[in-house]
Structures are given as C-alpha cells and as structure tokens.
C-alpha cells in the first residue's frame, strides 16, 4: 500500500488556510451573536503546520467549506417569535416526519372506513360513518398529528417532544406497537373488571390467541369490544353476561373466518 507523503506547504495552501479560518471564525461569531448558538466545538482549527499529509489537509478543507456553506442546513438557523432557535435541518426533519405520520394515519383511515360497524349483533352503518359522528381518533385510538409550525413552538422542551414524537410516529413500527399495547390493555381490563369469572376467564384466553392487528380490526368493527364497557376499578361496569356472550359470538365468527380482516401488513 502506498504511503501518503508528508505535505509540502505552498503559498497557495497558506492563503487558502487563512481564508477558510477567517470564514469559519466569522460564521461562529455571527451565529453566536445572532442566535446565541456556540459552534466553536463543531469544527477544529488546527495550525497549518500540524497537517502531516495532503490528504489530511484536503479533508480538513472539505469540512470547513461544508461548515460555511449556506446550503448546509445543519448550520443554518431560524429564531421564532418566542426566541426558540433551531437549525433548518431539524425543522425540515420534523416537518418531513409530521407529513409521513399524517400520511400513515390517513392511509389507515381510508383502509377502514368501509368496514361494517356492528352493535348488538347487527350492522349499524360503517366505521367511516362512525368516525363522522364521533371523531376518527375516538374510533381508532390513533390521533392524526397537526401540521408542524415552528412559529408556534414556545419552549425547547416542546420542540424536543415534537422532534422525538414525530420521528417515532413516522415509523410504521409505532402503529404495530400501539396495536399490541391496545390488545394487551383490553385483555387486562377484561380481567380486572370481573376479577375471576369463568366466562371472563375463557374470553381472556381466547383474546390472547388473537394477533394484535386482528384484534384492532375486531375492535373497530364490533361495538361490544370496547374499553368503555369494562372498568378496571370494578365500578360502573356495564359489561354483563349477555355482553360477554355476545363478544364470544363475535370471536366464534372470527375463528370461523367469517369476518373480513384485510389490514394485514398495514
């Protein structure tokens, strides 16, 4: 393997080095003064004599040029009316993730709106009609993120919450986890509502065998598969033996393959 020969510093190198250092220091000073952001630890300014090879110098030069390049949005900043400062890269990333999270929710709602809504064993319209009467988030348990507007952010804590939350919600895995958590929560609330009751125990065992994505669709379609009829504190429980039997009948239909579930892989 060929060795990189030691650099021979030319007058052009000296002039370029001086220019890059000047531009970098000006960028650091300007950013600190205008936005209160100290970038001095983001970039190194070693003495010209410290470079051992031409490759080292060229790599340093590339970093300086990138740092001062106006197209590099990691180091371009915006301050809103509340004095909150963020890089354009961060703002764009939150906007991108927000739009992706909205797209996923919109796609999900479109997939489920024509599904039947069944209460008391009879169809009472569609899931889409129910979303119009209530709200989509009430029906699905999943809210659609609002548009991101940096001008509305009043604190860095809020900005961090939005950044982390939208990054999470932009991932389809997030909704898989939500379905799994909803499934587990429903099983637990059924268990706690009646403590120990043979019909409930049997229902819990049947529910545990259902994949979370299938449970989510059953939750959307069948009115009685609802958190509002069960109470983990044992008070104001509306669930009765008749209702439990109705849920068992729905699970019978599911196990026979009589319920159209087509959100697999959503």
UniProtKB/Swiss-Prot annotation:
For the region Intermediate, what residue ranges are annotated?
74-172
This protein's UniProt keywords = Covalent protein-DNA linkage, Degradation of host cell envelope components during virus entry, Degradation of host peptidoglycans during virus entry, DNA replication, Early protein, Hydrolase, Phosphoprotein, Viral DNA replication, Virion, Virus entry into host cell
Spell out which residues are annotated as carrying O-(5'-phospho-DNA)-serine.
232
Q: Where in the cell is it found?
A: Virion
Q: Where is this region: Priming?
A: 173-266
Q: Which Pfam families match?
A: Phi-29_GP3
Stretches for region Disordered: 1-73
Main location per the UniProt record:
virion
**What GO terms describe the biological role, i.e. biological process, of this protein?**
DNA replication, synthesis of primer; symbiont entry into host cell via disruption of host cell envelope; symbiont entry into host cell via disruption of host cell wall peptidoglycan; viral DNA genome replication
KW Hydrolase (keyword) present: yes
Region: Interaction with the viral DNA polymerase; residue ranges are 256-258
Positions bearing the site annotation: Positions the 3' end of the template strand at the active site of the DNA polymerase = 230
Cited InterPro entries? DNA_terminal_Gp3, DNA_terminal_Gp3_C, DNA_terminal_Gp3_sf
* Keyword flag Phosphoprotein: yes
Q: Name one GO cellular component term.
A: virion component
The record's GO molecular-function terms, alphabetically, read:
hydrolase activity
Q: Which domain of life is it from?
A: Viruses
> What interactions and quaternary structure are annotated?
Interacts with the viral polymerase; this interaction allows the initiation of TP-primed DNA replication at both viral DNA ends. Binds to ssDNA. Interacts with the replication protein p1. Part of a DNA-gp3-gp16 complex.
> What exactly does this protein do?
Acts as a primer for DNA elongation during viral genomic replication. Acts as the small terminase protein during packaging. Recruits the phage DNA polymerase to the bacterial nucleoid. Primer terminal protein (TP) is covalently linked to the 5'-ends of both strands of the genome through a phosphodiester bond between the beta-hydroxyl group of a serine residue and the 5'-phosphate of the terminal deoxyadenylate (dAMP). Hydrolyzes host peptidoglycans during virus entry.
Q: Which family does it belong to?
A: Belongs to the phi29likevirus DNA terminal protein family.
Tell me the protein's name. DNA terminal protein
């Amino acid at each position: 393997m060929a060795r990189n020969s030691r650099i021979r510093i030319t007058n052009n190198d000296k002039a370029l080095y001086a220019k890059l250092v000047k531009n970098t220091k000006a960028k650091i000073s300007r950013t600190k003064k205008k936005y209160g952001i100290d970038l001095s630890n983001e970039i190194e300014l070693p003495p010209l004599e410290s470079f051992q090879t031409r490759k080292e110098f060229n790599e340093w030069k590339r970093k300086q040029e990138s740092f001062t390049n106006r197209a590099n949005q990691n180091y371009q900043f915006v301050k809103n009316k509340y004095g909150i400062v963020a890089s354009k890269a961060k703002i764009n990333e939150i906007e991108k993730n927000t739009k992706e999270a909205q797209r996923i929710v919109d796609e999900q709602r479109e997939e489920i709106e024509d599904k039947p809504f069944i209460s008391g064993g009879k169809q009472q319209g569609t899931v889409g009609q129910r979303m119009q009467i209530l709200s989509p988030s009430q029906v699905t348990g999943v809210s659609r993120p609002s548009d991101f507007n940096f001008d509305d952010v009043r604190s860095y804590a809020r900005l961090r919450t939005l950044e982390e939350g939208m990054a999470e919600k932009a991932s389809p895995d997030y909704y898989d986890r939500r379905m799994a958590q909803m499934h587990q929560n429903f099983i637990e609330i059924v268990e706690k509502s009646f403590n120990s009751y043979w019909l409930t125990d049997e229902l819990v065992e049947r529910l545990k065998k259902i994949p979370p994505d299938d449970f989510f669709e059953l939750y959307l379609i069948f009115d009685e598969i609802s958190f509002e009829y069960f109470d983990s504190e044992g008070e104001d429980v509306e669930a009765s033996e008749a209702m439990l039997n109705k849920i068992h009948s729905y699970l019978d239909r599911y196990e026979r393959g009589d319920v159209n579930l087509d959100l697999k892989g959503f």
